[in-house]
Amino acid sequence: MVKLSIVLTPQFLSHDQGQLTKELQQHVKSVTCPCEYLRKVINTLADHHHRGTDFGGSPWLHVIIAFPTSYKVVITLWIVYLWVSLLKTIFWSRNGHDGSTDVQQRAWRSNRRRQEGLRSICMHTKKRVSSFRGNKIGLKDVITLRRHVETKVRAKIRKRKVTTKINHHDKINGKRKTARKQKMFQRAQELRRRAEDYHKCKIPPSARKALCNWVRMAAAEHRHSSGLPYWPYLTAETLKNRMGHQPPPPTQQHSITDNSLSLKTPPECVLTPLPPSADDNLKTPPECVLTPLPPSADDNLKTPPECLLTPLPPSADDNLKTPPECLLTPLPPSADDNLKTPPECLLTPLPPSAPPSAPPSADDNLKTRAECLLHPLPPSADDNLKTPSERQLTPLPPSAPPSADDNIKTPAERLRGPLPPSADDNLKTPSERQLTPLPPSAPPSADDNIKTPAERLRGPLPPSADDNLKTPSERQLTPLPPSAPPSADDNIKTPAERLRGPLPPSADDNLKTPSERQLTPLPPSAPPSADDNIKTPAERLRGPLPPSADDNLKTPSERQLTPLPPSAPPSADDNIKTPAFHPQRMIISRHLPSVSSLPFHPQLHSQQMIISRYLLSVCGFRFHHQPMIISRHLPSVSSLPFHPQLHPQQMIISRHLPSVCGGRFHPQRMIISRHLPSVSSLPFHPQLHPQQMIISRHLPSVCGGRFHPQRMIISRHLPSVSSLPFHPQLHPQQMIISRHLPSVCGERLRGPLPPSADDNLKTPSERQLTPLPPSAPPSADDNIKTPAERLRRPLPPSADDNLKTPSERQLTPLPPSAPPSADDNIKTPAERLRGPLPPSADDNLKTPSERQLTPLPPSAPPSADDNIKTPAERLRGPLPPSADDNLKTPSERQLTPLPPSAPPSADDNIKTPAERLRGPLPPSADDNLKTPSERQLTPLPPSAPPSADDNIKTPAERLRGPLPPSADDNLKTPSERQLTPLPPSAPPSADDNIKTPAERLRGPLPPSADDNLKTPPLATQEAEAEKPRKPKRQRAAEMEPPPEPKRRRVGDVEPSRKPKRRRAADVEPSSPKPKRRRVGDVEPSRKPKRRRAADVEPSSPEPKRRRVGDVEPSRKPKRRRAADVEPSSPEPKRRRLS
C-alpha cells in the first residue's frame, strides 16, 4: 500500500479556491488513481476551507492518500487540534465559533438548507451568492463574521460565568445575590444587550428576511397543526420551499426563542399572530385578542354574547327593534326566527296566582312559573313567528280557590292547550282565540273547575275564505241588548253560548270578522245578584253580532267610538262591576319598575292595551286576572313586540292619566307613556291608516273618562316617536296629532249622527265624535244599562261614505251658548262641539283651518255644573283636515296668538292650562310631516278673569269657533293671522304658577322631513313679537342683500382705501368743490366712494347717512357698478401700497 502525505501549509491554504484546486491537482498528477476520488478530496477541502485562517500555532493538517492496491485509494483525514474543524464548524480560538445558535447563524443556515437552487444575498458582505452545493461562502465572509460576533461571544461567555457563579453561590447559601453580585449581574446583562444591539445593527435587511421567513413559516406550521388558518404573511419563497420539502415544523424554542433575545423579544408577541377572519367584523372580544375562537359558519350573532363587551354585528333587518333584554342573553339561532320571538320566550308573564289565602302547594310553586317564564317554545319550520306567543299569552279566566287536584291540571289546560290552525286562518284568527276573555265563572265545583273554562277558551270560530282583516272589528264592538236577570242554571251555560256560539261567516265578510266577534260588547245587565256576579260581564263582552255583506272597513270604528252619556251615581252593587277591568285589557303603569319585561302578545289588538303614565289610585280596583301593567321608567319597554298588524285606531299612548281610580276603561285600549324613551321601537303595523292614530300630549283627569277602546294617542315628547314605522302609504289626513286633550273625565261626546249617501270616508270619524244629548237623571237600573247602550249601538254605514267628509263636519264650531243652566249642563256644549256643518264644493284647502282657529266670543259666566263638562266638550272636538291642505296651512293656524288672559284664580290653577293645551287640529291627506307640529303648537288665547264656572268653558269657546273660509283664500292668509302678536298678559297670580310655564314650555314645533333647518326658528321669531315689525323687517330684508356685498367688497377694497384717501387729500387743495359737483353729476360713480366712506365710519358717518337717504332708490345699480369697478382700481392701489 502506497501512502502519499500532502502537507498543507498556511501559505498554501492562503490561496483562493481555484488556486488550491490547481495546486492539489499538480501534486497528485503523478499518482495513478481514478480522478473521481481525487476530485472528491479536493472538493471536500475546497468546500470547508476558509482563506486567511489563523491557526494559532497549531499543527498543520495532514492529508494522507493511501493506495492499498492498484486502482484503489484510501483517503484519511487527520484533524490534529479538535477546536479547528474545516468540515462543519468555523473556528474556536480568538475567532472561534462557540456553537451557539444565534439569529444570524440560524438565518444563514436556513437559507443554505432550505433555499437550495435560489439566489440570495450574503448577510455580512451583502454579496449575491448561490446556495448550490460545492460553492459556499468564502473566507472573507467568515472573517467579517468573526469580527461581528467577537463582542457578543465574549459578553455571552462572561454572562455564563457570572450566572453560574451566582447560581452556585445561591444554591449553597440559600440566599439571593449580594449587592456586589447583583451589580456584576446587571453589568453582564448590559454587556449582553449591547452585544445584541451591535449584532442586530450589523444584520442587513436581506439577512433579516431569511429569519423572518423562517419565523413566519414556523408560526404557520404551528397554526396549521392546530387547525387554524394559515399565516397570511408567508413569502412566496418560503411557501415554495415549504410546499416542496414539507420539513417537520420546528419547535418554537429552537426556531424562535433564544437566550440572547429572551429579554428583548418576547416570544408571545412575535410568534403568536392572531388569525385573520374574513367574517370577523366586530365580534372578536377585546379580552380574547390573543385567544382566537374557532369560527362557525352558522354562528353569526350568538357566539359573542357570551362575552359581555362583544358588540353585536349590525343586521339589515334589525332597525330599532332589537330588545335590550336580548343583548346580554344569547338565544339559540333559528332560521325563521324573527326578532320578536326571543322577547316572547324570555319575558312570558305568569298567570295570576290563586288568592293568597289559599295554601300553596309544592307542585304549583314550580310548574306554573317555570312554564310561563323560563320555558321557551321550540320553533317549528312552518310555524309563524306569532304561533308560540299566541299560546303563551292566552288569558285564562280567574279560577276558583285552588284545590289539590286543580293545582296542576287547570292552569295547564288553560295555558297549554293550543288551538288547531286552519288553512284559511288569517293572522288575526289566533289572536281572536287567544285573547277572548272568559266571563267569571260561578263558584266552581269539582267538575266545573276544568270543563267550563276550556269550553270558553278553546271554542274557535270557523274562519271564512273571504274574511277580510277588518271585518272582525265590526263584530267585536257590536253591542248586545242587556240580558235578563240570570238564573242558577244560566250561570254557566249562558256565557258559553254567547261567547262560543260562532256566527256563520258570509262570503263577503271583510277581514274584521273575527275581531268583531271578539270584542263585541254586551249591554250591562240588571243589578247584579250573587249569581250574576260572573255572568253579566260575559254577556256584555261576548255576544257577537252577525256582520253584514256591505260593511265597509270603517264601520267598526263608527261603532267603537260612540260615546256614552254619564252614568248615574254608583250604587253598592255597582261597586264591583263598574271598576272591573275588561279581561282583555292591558295597563302599563309608570311606577311599576319590574313590569318592563312583560312580553305583549305580538297579535294583541292594540285596542286591548293601555300603557299609562299615572295610575295613582289603582289599589282599589279589582283588576282582571290578565291585566298587564308596564312602568313608565322601564327602559326596556321598547322591546315590547306589539303586533305588526295593529290598527292604530286601537292604540292610545297618553302622557297623563292621573286619577284612573274612578275610570271605566274599555278593555281594548292602549295607552303608552310619554317618557318611555324606547317607545319608538314599537313595531306598529306598516299598513296602519294614519287617520286612526291620535297622538296627544296631555290627558290629565281621566278619573271620570270613558275612553273608547279603538283610539291611539301618542305622546308629544317621546323623542323617538319619529322612528315609529308607520305605513309608507299612510294618508296624512288620517293622522291626528293633538297637543291638548285635558279633562277626559267629564266627556260625554259620543252621540253618532246618521251618515248621508255622499259622506266621504271620514263618516265613521263623524260618528265617533258625535256628542249625544244628555240623558235623563239616571235611575238605579240605568246605572249599568244606559252607558252600554250608548257605547255599543253602531250606526249603519252608507255605501258612498268617503273618508274625509266627516272631518269637515266634526270640527265645525258652534256659536257660544247662553249662560248655562242646570239642564244645559250636558246638552249645550255637545251641541256646540258636535254639530258638523255640511262642507261646500268650492271650499279651498284652508277652509277647515280657517274655521278651526277662529276665536269665539267668550261665553256667559259658567255655572257650578258647567265646571266639569265644558272642557271635555271643548277638548275633544278635533278639527277635520282637508284633502288638499298644504304643509304650511297648519303652521299658519297654529301660531295664531290669542289675547292675554285675566289673572288666574285658584280654580284656574289646574284646569285652564289643560284647556289651552288640548285643542288638537286634524291633519289633511296631503299634509307633510310638519302638519301635526304646526297644529300642536297652536297657541290659545288667554281667558278672561276666570270665575268658578268659567274655569273651563270660556277658553273652549274661543278655541273652537272657526270662521267659514273663502274660496280664494291663499295658503299664506293664515300665516298672516297666525303671527299677530298678543297684548301682554296680566300679572301672574299664585294659581298661574303652573299654567304659564306649561304654555311657554310646551310649544315645541316637531321637525318634518321637508322642513329646512331654518324654517322653525323663523316661524318662532315671527310668532313671538315681530308682527308690528313686519314692515320694518321687509325694509330690512330689502336692505339686507346690499350690505352683504358691501361687506365683501369692503374686505376686498380695505387695503386700497387708504391710498384713495391719500389721493383725495392730494387733490383736495386743488379743487374739492368741483369734486363734490362731479360726484353729484355722476351718481353711479359716487356710490363706490360713499360705500368706502361707509366702510370708514370714523371719517365721516354723518354725510354718509345724509347721502344714503338721498340716493336710496338708485343704490342697488350703483353698488353693482361699484362692484364692477372695484376690482380694477383696488388691485393697482394694492400694488402701489405694497
Swiss-Prot record:
Q: In the UniProt record, does the keyword Transmembrane helix occur?
A: yes
Q: Which UniProt keywords apply?
A: Membrane, Transmembrane, Transmembrane helix
Q: What compartments host this protein?
A: Membrane
Locate the compositionally biased regions of type Pro residues: 349-359
The yes or no answer to whether the keyword Membrane is present is yes
Lineage: superkingdom? Eukaryota
Pfam families per record: NPB13-l_MII_rpt (PF20885), NPIP (PF06409)
Compositional bias annotation for Basic and acidic residues: 406-416, 448-458, 490-500, 532-542, 782-792, 824-834, 866-876, 908-918, 950-960, 992-1002
The record lists the lineage as: Eukaryota, Metazoa, Chordata, Craniata, Vertebrata
What protein does this entry describe? Nuclear pore complex-interacting protein family member B13
Q: InterPro entries, per this entry?
A: NPB13-like_MII_rpt, NPIP, NPIP_N
Where is this chain compositionally biased, Polar residues type? 252-263
Species of origin:
Homo sapiens
Name a GO CC annotation attached to this entry.
membrane
Q: Where do the TM regions start and end?
A: 73-93
Q: Where is this region: Disordered?
A: 242-578, 747-1138
Q: What is its main location?
A: membrane
The Swiss-Prot or TrEMBL record describes its family as follows:
Belongs to the NPIP family.
What kind of membrane protein is this, topologically? Single-pass membrane protein
